[in-house]
């Protein structure tokens, strides 16, 4: 039997609606659901939807997180994975953001 790698992944389905004016009345138009990797809060989902639907009056109706366990044979993982290269400490120091200096 092949060895399997397992990983628990949380995805969040975001249900969003758009406000539209029809005959002088505001109506709600349900938009397609979006799914994101991770456990998003309502605020995070709202921010992402506002970025996607720039300038449109959209509102997140609900967020539905769902966690499932995924598995993959180790051989398949090795076929598609890349080796992670550790950075030297000197390289890390150069890539870090400079610290703010406090005026005395």
UniProtKB/Swiss-Prot annotation:
UniProtKB keywords: DNA condensation, DNA replication, DNA-binding, Early protein, Repressor, Transcription, Transcription regulation, Viral DNA replication
Outcome reported for the amino acid change (mutating residue 10 to A/K): Decreased DNA-binding affinity. No effect on dimerization
DNA-binding region residue numbers: 1-19
GO cellular component, one term: transcription repressor complex
Gene Ontology MF terms: DNA binding; DNA-binding transcription repressor activity
Any single biological process term in GO: regulation of viral transcription
Induction note: Expressed in the early phase of the viral replicative cycle.
Pfam families in the cross-refs: p6
Compositionally biased tracts (Acidic residues): 88-104
Region annotation Disordered: where it falls in the sequence: 85-104
Family that this chain belongs to: Belongs to the phi29likevirus histone-like protein p6 family.
Quaternary organization: Homodimer. Homomultimer. Binds to double-stranded DNA giving rise to multimeric nucleoprotein complexes. Binding specificity for the viral DNA is based on supercoiling, the viral genome having a negative superhelicity lower than that of plasmid DNA. Interacts with the DNA replication protein p17; this interaction optimizes the binding of protein p6 at the viral DNA ends, thus favoring the initiation of replication. Interacts with the late genes activator p4 (via C-terminus).
Chain's role: Histone-like nucleoprotein that binds to the viral dsDNA and responsible for wrapping and compacting the viral DNA about 4-fold. Forms a nucleoprotein complex in which the DNA adopts a right-handed toroidal conformation winding around a protein core. Binds ito most, if not all, the viral genome, although with different affinity, the highest one corresponding to the genome ends. The formation of the nucleoprotein complex at the genome ends, activates the initiation of viral DNA replication. The binding of p6 would recruit the complex formed by the TP and the DNA polymerase to the origin.
Domain writeup: The N-terminus is involved in DNA-binding.
Name listed for the protein in its UniProt record: Histone-like protein p6
Organism this protein belongs to: Bacillus phage phi29
């Amino acid at each position: 039997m092949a060895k399997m790698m397992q990983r628990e992944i949380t995805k969040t389905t975001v249900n969003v609606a758009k406000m539209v004016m029809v005959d002088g009345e505001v109506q709600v138009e349900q938009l397609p659901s979006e799914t994101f990797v991770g456990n998003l809060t309502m605020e995070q989902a709202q921010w992402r939807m506002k970025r996607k639907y720039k300038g449109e009056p959209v509102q997140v109706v609900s967020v539905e997180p769902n966690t499932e366990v995924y598995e993959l044979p180790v051989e398949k993982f090795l076929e598609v994975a890349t080796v992670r290269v550790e950075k030297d400490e000197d390289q890390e120091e150069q890539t870090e953001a400079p610290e703010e200096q406090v005026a005395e």
